[in-house]
Amino acid sequence: MWNDIEKAGVELADELCKHDPVRPNLPQHWRVVPNWREVFYLKTNHMIDSVLCVAHLDGIPINEDELLSFGNGNISVFYSVWSNKKGSGRKIVLDTLDLLKSQHSNNRYVTMSPKTEMAMKFHTDNGAKLLQENPLTYNFEYTIIFEYE
């Protein structure tokens, strides 16, 4: 049904994030810095089905100002996700978790989500636990179980 997730380069990320309904105010040029901030996407037949923006930070942000100011670290923060096709939002979150688990030494995977019922339902239905409720956002945490041989 879908291809594997792909990581967007700077130019494609700029184009994709022009349509970000969750965090439209974030600067386009801020979203991609190698090994720090990444944009992933799913597509089918050259059509974008979903997009997920991730920043690897040294703290858990509760608002956009903190998101923009925190430094590089080992907490992967999913700060924006949107989809154009049913089921692709779930797929990109779970597939990106698997990818990051295999590629990074990060030890926490959290969101900075809008404080909406939709965000609450989406993340809890996908296995995340509410970490904290903030004035404008929720932080959810996805627990990753590492398999050792």
What are these regions (language model features)?
Residues S83-S102, D125:
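Conserved acetyl-CoA-binding loop-helix of GNAT-fold acetyltransferases
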Residues K121-K129:
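Short, aromatic/basic amphipathic alpha-helical patches
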Residues M1-R31, Y41:
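Short amphipathic alpha-helix that is part of the acyltransferase structural core
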Residues V110-K121, L136-N139:
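Conserved beta-strand-loop-alpha-helix junction that forms the acyl-donor binding cleft
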Residues H29-S50, A55-D58:
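A short helix-loop-beta-strand connector motif used in the catalytic cores of GNAT acetyltransferases and
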Residues K129-T143:
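Conserved catalytic-core motifs of GNAT/GCN5-like acyltransferases
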Residues V51-S76:
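Conserved acyl-donor/pantetheine-binding loop and adjacent beta-alpha core of acyl/acetyltransferases
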